[in-house]
Regions:
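N-terminal cap/lid segment of alpha/beta-hydrolase-fold proteins
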Residues: 23-70
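Alpha/beta-hydrolase-fold enzymes
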Residues: 162-247
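Short beta-strand/loop motif that positions the catalytic acidic residue
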Residues: 282, 288-290
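Catalytic histidine-centered segment of alpha/beta-hydrolase-like enzymes
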Residues: 320-333
Length: 348
């Protein structure tokens, strides 16, 4: 456990070494976009993935838990794509801990407080591994029931969670909330409007030209986060992203979407991949959760069609947009009762 969990601290600061020997300075105190619950104990931890990258995470567990008497069902949470653990994933994790689960919300490789260079890059392989490394960490804890582990991915991490569930048989239950299939949207554009060889060729040429530029400059140019200033004619879902990432509601200084965004060549890893290729082989339970009015709803519904078995659920939240399922949208849109019931049923 000492090798996997590099450091933990309930309050104050902590440093942990990544694979390069550099130290990760973790923040002191509470810096989330949501209030701290008095029903939950919180601690900072770090652990390494299979690629040697050190990930930073927040652990949440019910107040009053005692080891070894209390071994909790556990859930690893991450997302949205381009967010940090202080945003939506932390809210999900803390809320589920209030309901009796031990949870972790982690920053993916190359982002937030986690290690890895270059910064602000995504990878379908490494980011799937991030979920699996979180499972490794949970299994190492004395207060976790190792046969009752689930994962929860939000937005682009919903698709990655399904991919992780397809390869990691230790994951007994998976929730994909307001999910994106990042490989599909990268290759085909929104609503599959760029689903042609010519369109993909143009994207590849642009990204490879950027590779040359980055190599020569020795830096990685960022693509920009959520558009700012917001154009008056922006699509509603872009306005919704702005309302979350660019306002006090969800802004965080370490969030890519709130600031400079991913590096421009990051999409190269996704454009030729098929993230959900083996979704139909997942034997354990999966819930796909989406808002009725979400622009991304088609990702979730199409993913659900790939799943097989009686232990798969599709939940459409009436009136909810994509971003309403980040933090409830001020109207309690996240169906935590339904999520809890799903995990209770399947983590047993």
């Amino acid at each position: 456990m000492k090798e996997l969990a590099m450091a933990a601290l309930a309050a104050g600061g902590v440093c942990a070494a990544d694979a390069t020997g550099a130290f990760l300075p973790l923040t002191k105190g509470w810096d989330k976009t949501f209030p701290q619950s008095d029903k939950v104990e919180h601690a900072k931890v770090t652990f390494r993935n299979r690629f040697g990258i050190t990930l930073a995470a927040d652990v949440y567990k019910p107040v009053g838990s005692r080891v070894p008497r209390d071994r909790h069902p556990a859930i690893a949470v991450s997302g949205p794509f381009g967010a940090v653990k202080e945003q939506s994933s932390g809210l999900y994790a803390q809320t589920l801990a209030e309901r009796g689960f031990l949870t972790i919300a982690f920053d993916p490789s190359f982002t937030g407080e986690s290690g890895g260079t270059p910064r602000y890059v995504a990878s379908p392989d490494i980011n799937t591994e991030d979920f699996q490394a979180a499972v490794d960490y949970l299994i190492s804890r004395d207060d976790v029931d190792v046969d009752k582990i689930g994962i929860l991915g939000i937005c682009g991490w919903g698709g990655l969670a399904i991919n992780a569930a397809a390869v990691d048989t230790r994951v007994k239950a998976t929730v994909a909330s307001t999910m994106y299939d990042m490989t599909r949207v990268t290759a085909n554009g929104y609503f599959d409007k760029e689903d042609s060889a010519a369109a993909r060729q143009a994207k590849k040429e642009a990204m490879n030209a950027q590779r040359i530029k980055d190599f020569k400059s020795g830096t990685y140019e960022l693509g920009g986060g959520v558009v700012d200033p917001l154009p008056a004619d922006a699509p509603q879902f872009v306005k919704d992203y702005y309302a979350y990432y660019k306002t006090p509601r969800g802004y965080h200084a370490r969030s890519l979407n709130s600031n400079g965004g991913w590096n421009k060549t990051s999409a190269l890893s996704f454009i030729n991949a098929k993230l959900l290729a083996y979704a139909g082989e997942i034997e354990n339970a999966v819930m796909v959760l989406h808002g009725e009015k979400a622009h991304s709803r088609y990702f979730g519904e199409d993913a659900f069609k790939m799943l097989k078995g009686e232990n798969k659920e599709l939940v459409i939240v009436p009136g909810a947009s994509h971003c309403d399922l980040y933090d409830g949208g001020g109207k309690g849109a996240i169906p935590f009762d339904r999520i809890e019931a799903f995990y209770r049923k399947n983590l047993k």
